[in-house]
């Protein structure tokens, strides 16, 4: 086995004995597993295998994402943090100098995040409605990146409204689009184009990448705030 730095800072490539490759993040809290992920040890460091079937961000990276603005020290507004599967890897990447403001609508789901944030002080869990960004104005600072994983028909508007309130000029948005959540009657490609058009009225659209085969009818769109 071997571990190498990935092209994105804070992400690593684990090369297995059979030559297969996985991506991983260096565990910020050694010994902590978050969602049953495999942990590997290499040269005194602990790495958590990042499962693309459980994380849309991992799927995008493995599908050769070109733009990944999350790096050590980044401040992230995470819309739809859920129980923290992907956020835990983002937490590893940004380190103690970075911060995640995690918005979750469901009190039950947010409770599942509590054991994680007790160890990971760079995650701030917030019970809130991502469609109403003014509700958490007292808790969230300006951020470098907004990551949105909210399966709603108004996904694009949610990102735009939160970016107006919290995203720094020159900052990036990353949005996971589930086409069937927006319009089940249209082909996914048509939905993705319509979302891109809506986003382009406020952002510069930087990249769109399919999440197949890990997620059916999903894409990740990366945008930049002028």
UniProtKB/Swiss-Prot annotation:
EC number: 2.1.1.-
Keyword entries, A-Z: Methyltransferase, RNA-binding, rRNA processing, Transferase, tRNA processing
InterPro entries: Fibrillarin, Fibrillarin_CS, SAM-dependent_MTases_sf
GO MF term set: histone H2AQ104 methyltransferase activity; RNA binding; rRNA methyltransferase activity
UniProt keyword annotation of Methyltransferase present: yes
Record text on subunit structure and interactions: Interacts with nop5. Component of box C/D small ribonucleoprotein (sRNP) particles that contain rpl7ae, FlpA and nop5, plus a guide RNA.
Protein name: Fibrillarin-like rRNA/tRNA 2'-O-methyltransferase
Organism expressing this protein natively: Thermococcus sibiricus (strain DSM 12597 / MM 739)
Higher taxonomy: Archaea, Methanobacteriati, Methanobacteriota, Thermococci, Thermococcales
